[in-house]
Amino acid sequence: TARRNIEGEITIEEVQHLVKTYYQRKTAREEDDDKKEEADRVSANIAQLLGEDSFVYSVVGITSIHRRIFEGVFKHAGEIRNFDISKKEWVLRGDSVLYGNAPDLRRALVYDLEQEREFSYIGIPIDKTIKHIAKCISGLWQIHPFAEGNTRTTAVFTIKYLRSLGFQVNNDLFSQKSWYFRNALVRANYHNY
């Protein structure tokens, strides 16, 4: 299905329909079918999002990205979580990053997005530009505004933001090195004082 879409034989909407009907009609179930279905649906949704030129740099924009990636996958797609979380990370030997607390998530997103919006890249060398963007994206990820799907949402948001700044970026590196991307975000936000 993916190959047929890449070669232009079918649209992304047709891919989404084929994925949905495949899992609805499948009679023999395997233990990991739920994970496979999530991955297939999310991949098709991400491809659709990245195929669009639109981008809104705001809290509404990032929550919309989450909703569109996970619609039909998570009941809470596009909703900012209302509970606190911690996650034992193997890369931190079971320790957790300190994520944003539930009552402050929206304000934290607004603050981080505004700080970035006010930053001027004029005259900044490319190495410092990249370092600044990495810090910005890392900070957004640390807020972890959603119950699930924060890393994938951050990746799509990052691609669309970089494109809005004039960078030519696609999803290949993020999809091929997703585990590295997540672990880099974890390490960038870990403090063990």
Labelled PLM ranges:
Residues 1-193:
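FIC/Doc superfamily catalytic core
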